[in-house]
């Protein structure tokens, strides 16, 4: 009997013939970006994160072309006019969108695409094309409030508005394929990784 040696649960041949789109969504401050970076670090040959387009200004430490493609409102409108965006959303006064060309670019590399996007965007994509939707949730509303406060990126009325929006987002969790409670980062990552491995081996016939 021939032995099959498996160094990775992800098959390059399977990724090339059957590339998938994963969407990961969560209220602000829950840890979705950190979890995706952990996944990319361990399985860089299997996955790549899509780079969204946004009109908002870069935050401290963000790198244009790596974290986001930062554009003006006029440039964003031109993308809409050309129907270049698979999905887009207007959120807190700024626009965010995902380009189908960006997803296809990742697929052409023989990798699965991972889009870390707003909940509205994830549900819209799900209605238009096959995708695996994952929702990252906080362990409690109190913990969500604490994490939002610790971010320090919003103050006063902005933080209140962000919290109210986050509570609305939590109510949409049951519309996703998977829900992960991020109470412990390492445990949440183990669950996330198991989902990706299971989806890699899902029978699509």
UniProtKB/Swiss-Prot annotation:
- Localization annotation: Cytoplasm
Family the UniProt entry places it in: Belongs to the guanylate kinase family.
Instruction: Please state the Enzyme Commission number of this protein.
Output: 2.7.4.8
According to UniProt, the name of this protein is Guanylate kinase
**What gene name is listed for this protein?**
gmk
Its UniProt entry gives the catalysed reaction(s) as:
GMP + ATP = GDP + ADP
The record ties this protein, via CDD domains, to: GMPK
Cross-referenced PANTHER family, in alphabetical order? Answer: GUANYLATE KINASE, GUANYLATE KINASE-RELATED
Per UniProt, ATP binds at 26-33
State the SMART domains in the record. Answer: GuKc (SM00072)
Q: What is its main location?
A: cytoplasm
UniProt GO molecular function: ATP binding; guanylate kinase activity
What is one Pfam family matched by this protein?
A: Guanylate_kin
GO CC annotation: cytosol
Q: Which UniProt keywords apply?
A: ATP-binding, Cytoplasm, Kinase, Nucleotide-binding, Transferase
Q: Which InterPro entries match?
A: GK/Ca_channel_bsu (IPR008145), Guanylate_kin-like_dom (IPR008144), Guanylate_kinase (IPR017665), Guanylate_kinase_CS (IPR020590), P-loop_NTPase (IPR027417)
List residues of the Guanylate kinase-like domain.
19-197
- What does this protein's UniProt record list under function? Essential for recycling GMP and indirectly, cGMP.
């Amino acid at each position: 009997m021939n032995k099959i040696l498996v160094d990775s649960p992800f098959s390059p041949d399977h990724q090339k013939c059957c590339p998938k789109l994963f969407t990961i969504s969560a209220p602000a401050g829950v840890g979705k970006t950190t979890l995706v970076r952990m996944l990319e670090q361990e399985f860089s040959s299997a996955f790549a994160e899509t780079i969204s387009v946004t009109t908002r200004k870069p935050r401290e430490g963000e790198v244009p072309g790596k974290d986001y493609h930062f554009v003006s409102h006029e440039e964003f409108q031109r993308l809409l006019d050309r129907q270049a965006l698979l999905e887009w959303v207007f959120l807190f006064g700024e626009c965010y969108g995902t380009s189908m060309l960006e997803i296809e670019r990742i697929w052409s590399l023989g990798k699965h695409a991972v889009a870390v996007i707003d909940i509205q965007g994830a549900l819209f994509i799900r209605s238009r094309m096959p995708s695996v939707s994952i929702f990252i949730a906080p362990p409690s509303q109190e913990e969500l409030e604490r994490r939002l406060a610790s971010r320090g990126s919003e103050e006063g009325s902005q933080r209140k508005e962000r919290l109210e929006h986050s509570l609305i987002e939590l109510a949409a969790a049951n519309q996703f394929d998977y829900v992960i409670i991020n109470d412990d980062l390492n445990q949440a990552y183990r669950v996330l990784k198991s989902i990706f491995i299971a989806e890699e081996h899902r029978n699509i016939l």
